[in-house]
């Protein structure tokens, strides 16, 4: 198999291999890297996944992208080390399941990508004898997952930006207590401000002497590992070649794009439900063909999804033959008919989010947090317009309910237990910087962090 190449969604940069795409984060033309072609699995190959543990499925999926870049035995070891935690699938009712992606080091689905990315980054930097600074904007969980995964990785410095007033206490403490090679910066603004500052830094001529990369879902290294758990879920809940419905809480659309990648690789998918909160730019676009960013983004209980312009829409538009630039301008419309056939999207209010937590607890004794509740309610909206039939469905729960103790307590009357993987961080002293949502100040901060002499 030849080495797979990745192209920019803006189409003005040369195609590169996975190593180059991963280390760069964003293409020089400000587009996002995406596979030129999707490697495929045969139905027989996918059928064998039912007998395999998670780390082995991860190896088989990711090896399709790392051929010629990472030796197979090295990749297998990386997968075994990265995925040493369970991936529970709980039955809600007949053929409808809840997949909890909250068992990793920071109790978030972001651990699945961050743990693998850190190992890939570490290997590539050692091979090249290089140093790198990773800039990451977080709306809640990415920062903690990236900070923990890259903590004390030689050659890597991590700088995380988060909206000061829009993350929960536990989300904040999971990233502000690490120190060493990790710095966190509270921004007096929205997540979109944080993300815009990171993107500007990549394109800033004054910072070209600083080797920068990103661990946000603009980095292809985040996206590819997130395709694995869709293969895993299907292998546990579906018969051979049986299509699955996935309902996914969607903010920056990296999680949802993992399902799209899996489908493009051959996984039978009946429908992808992209459930959003009050930041409803995508369902409106899907309905009307007109895209308008939400600025500023709207606050919701599902705070990790408070994204007014999802970066990964550029990749989704590209899959369907269109082109969206980094500002959200659509230069070529995608095939909307095909997109509507494959994807259903709906906006869930905070009131319905609260109702979903209560409904699932009262009826099924399963505890959701706000993001999982958005996915549950999105699934309900889809089944109101299309029949599920006998197809299996998987609702994605992206964070541990203990990250949202106040919200959960208001609904069910008690606070969820804090998992052991979170307890230690919550007891440590915090250390973070704070600044206005001002790019010039952020540039000065970066220059001070990276003196040239």
Regions found by a protein language model. Name each.
Residues 1-453:
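PLP-dependent amino-acid enzyme catalytic core
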């Amino acid at each position: 198999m030849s080495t797979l190449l990745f192209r920019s969604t803006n189409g003005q940069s040369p195609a590169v291999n996975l190593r180059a795409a991963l280390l760069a984060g964003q293409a020089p033309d400000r587009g996002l890297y995406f596979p030129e072609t999707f490697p495929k699995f045969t139905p027989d190959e996918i059928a064998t996944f039912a007998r395999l543990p998670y780390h082995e499925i991860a190896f088989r999926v990711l090896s399709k992208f790392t051929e010629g870049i990472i030796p197979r035995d090295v990749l297998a070891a990386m997968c075994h080390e990265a995925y040493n935690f369970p991936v529970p699938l709980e039955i809600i009712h007949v053929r409808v399941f809840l997949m909890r992606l909250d068992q990793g080091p920071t109790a978030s689905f972001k651990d699945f990508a961050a743990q693998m990315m850190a190992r890939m980054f570490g290997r590539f930097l050692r091979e090249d004898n290089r140093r790198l600074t990773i800039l990451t904007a977080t709306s809640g969980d990415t920062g903690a997952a990236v900070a923990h995964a890259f903590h004390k990785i030689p050659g890597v410095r991590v700088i995380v930006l988060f909206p000061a007033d829009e993350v929960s206490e536990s989300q904040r403490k999971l990233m502000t207590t690490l120190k060493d090679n990790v710095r966190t910066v509270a921004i007096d603004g929205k997540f979109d401000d944080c993300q815009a500052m990171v993107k500007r830094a990549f394109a800033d001529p004054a910072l070209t002497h600083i080797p920068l990369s990103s661990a946000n879902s603009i980095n292809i290294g985040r996206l590819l590992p997130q395709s694995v758990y869709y293969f895993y879920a299907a292998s546990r809940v579906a018969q051979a070649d049986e299509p699955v419905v996935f309902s996914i809480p969607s903010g920056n659309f990296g999680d949802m794009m993992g399902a799209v990648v899996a489908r493009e690789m051959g996984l039978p998918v009946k429908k992808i439900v992209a459930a959003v909160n009050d930041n409803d730019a995508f369902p409106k676009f899907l309905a009307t063909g007109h895209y308008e960013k939400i600025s500023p983004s709207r606050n919701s209980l599902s705070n990790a999804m408070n994204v007014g312009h999802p970066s990964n829409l550029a990749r989704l538009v590209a899959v369907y033959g269109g082109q969206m630039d980094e500002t959200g301008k659509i230069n070529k419309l995608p095939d909307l008919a095909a997109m509507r056939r494959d994807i259903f999207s709906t906006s869930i209010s905070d009131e319905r989010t609260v109702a979903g937590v209560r409904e699932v607890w009262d009826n099924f004794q399963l505890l959701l947090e706000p993001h999982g509740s958005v996915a549950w309610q999105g699934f309900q909206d889809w089944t109101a317009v299309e029949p599920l039939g006998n197809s299996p469905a998987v609702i994605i729960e992206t964070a541990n309910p203990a990250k949202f103790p106040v919200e959960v307590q208001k609904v069910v009357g008690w606070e969820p237990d804090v998992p052991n993987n979170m307890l230690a961080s919550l007891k440590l002293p915090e250390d973070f910087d704070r600044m206005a949502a001002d790019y010039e100040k952020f540039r000065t901060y970066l220059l001070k962090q990276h003196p040239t002499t």
